[in-house]
Swiss-Prot record:
Native species: Methanosarcina barkeri (strain Fusaro / DSM 804)
GO molecular function, one term: RNA binding
Name this polypeptide is given: Ribonuclease P protein component 3
Role, per record: Part of ribonuclease P, a protein complex that generates mature tRNA molecules by cleaving their 5'-ends.
Keywords: Cytoplasm, Endonuclease, Hydrolase, Nuclease, tRNA processing
Family statement: Belongs to the eukaryotic/archaeal RNase P protein component 3 family.
Reactions catalysed according to its record: Endonucleolytic cleavage of RNA, removing 5'-extranucleotides from tRNA precursor
SUPFAM superfamilies xref list: PHP domain-like
Compartment list: Cytoplasm
EC number: 3.1.26.5
Main location: cytoplasm
PANTHER family per UniProt: RIBONUCLEASE P PROTEIN SUBUNIT P30, RIBONUCLEASE P SUBUNIT P30
Length: 239
């Protein structure tokens, strides 16, 4: 078995975050990642698409984190951006937005589902997430910047969603949510923090390796991929 490849699929660069793509990608590579997804919020996109630095050993994937409270408008944004990004995230935080995201198979990841006194998920939404293969994110940054009761509440919400994910076989993605270079943590540190949140070692490892790779494979199909509605004919069947 080869060495696992680690990915951080929620990183924000200027003008959304504090650092440039080059600065973030250089540090992420130094920390041991094989790739990151640039996922600026949709209301803080740069005027022009920055060049995404990539090599054979490290890649910056094009992504977006959609911010929209109206479910109908959210679906419109999903349709607008889906074909142009590798990673499409919805910023949750209300029951209506969470439901709209988890019921849409074109969404890759739901971030920040919690709201008020709710973890943001329930049995119905967890089933939708599993059926539509929408992953739930576990973001490290809020834990690093919180103390006292707020951190207790964050951990409680994470563990509640983790229980639902286990019960209904929902995919998890472990990300930094970095708004600056100071928010990035090495894969080993991230895995250790995930275990503090209640993830088993194999669950945390899958959330930072296997699930991100599956998202990219789904959105960047290889030459053998057959698009829906296209029939493959065997030799001699062309008449």
């Amino acid at each position: 078995m080869g060495k696992p490849k680690f990915y951080d699929f929620c990183v924000h660069a200027v003008p959304d975050g504090e650092n440039t793509v080059d600065q973030l990608s250089a540090l992420a590579r130094h920390l041991g990642y094989s790739g990151i997804a640039l996922t600026n919020h949709s209301d803080k996109l740069p005027q022009s698409q920055p060049v995404l630095p990539s090599t054979n050993e490290f890649e910056v994937f094009k992504g977006i984190e959609l911010v929209e409270e109206n479910p109908s408008k959210l679906h419109g944004l999903i349709g607008k951006f889906r074909k142009s990004v590798d990673v499409l995230i919805v910023h949750g935080g209300s029951e209506n937005v969470n439901r709209a995201a988890l019921e849409n198979p074109r969404v890759d990841i739901l971030n920040h589902p919690a709201f008020a006194k709710s973890s943001g998920l329930n049995q119905v939404l967890a089933k939708s997430a599993a059926e539509n293969d929408v992953a739930i994110s576990l973001i490290i940054r809020p834990l690093l910047h919180s103390r006292g009761p707020r951190r207790v509440r964050l951990l409680s919400n994470l563990r509640a969603n983790l229980d639902l994910a286990r019960k209904y076989d929902v995919s998890l993605v472990l990300s930094s949510g970095a708004m600056s270079c100071f928010d990035l943590r090495s894969p080993m540190e991230t895995l250790a923090l995930a275990e503090v949140c209640g993830l088993e070692e194999d669950e945390a490892l899958e959330a930072i390796t296997v699930v991100p790779e599956r998202i990219i494979s789904r959105n960047r199909p290889g030459p053998g991929h057959v698009r829906e509605g296209i029939e493959v004919l065997e030799e001699g069947d062309y008449s």
